[in-house]
Amino acid sequence: VLALVAALAAAGCGGEVSVPKTERTEHAGAVLFNQRCSGCHSLDAANAYGSRPTGNRYLKYSERTNGPNFNQRKEKRDDVLFAIRNGGFSGAIMPANVVVGRDARLIADFVSRYSGGSGSEAARAKQR
């Protein structure tokens, strides 16, 4: 199990996040999301593309580790914290307490602000 968690965490390491460093809390949450969550979840603001990579001709179906795509799904802070603490909502493959304490709160703040497609902070920023 630890090997799986380590592999998923390593797979999540991507490039630069698009959240400005001037937004310290959200930027820190985006970096943590990229490092710890992007192996299974997608969210453009964190440069995270773990929910079935688009355009991959070799990957016809979603993988078991694919979590929700937060570009399409809006989340509330308390729901994100619940999912982090309990390993998601459905008892799926997400490990419980994948991050804890301040890191969990930073990720929850970031996801609650930037998730949700056209209603998200990221989408509004692109329109400016």
Task: Specify the residue positions occupied by each region the protein language model found.
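Bacterial N-terminal signal peptides that target proteins for export
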Residues: 1-2
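Gram-negative bacterial Sec-dependent N-terminal signal peptides
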Residues: 5-6
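Periplasmic/extracellular electron-transfer cofactor-ligation site
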Residues: 17-25, 30-69, 86-93, 113-123
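C-terminal capping alpha-helices of c-type cytochrome domains
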Residues: 96-128
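Extracytoplasmic/secreted envelope proteins and their assembly/folding machinery
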Residues: 67, 77, 81-84, 104, ...
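Short, surface-exposed ligand-recognition loops at beta-strand->loop->(often short) alpha-helix junctions
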Residues: 72-73
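Extended amphipathic secondary-structure runs
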Residues: 77, 81-91, 95-97
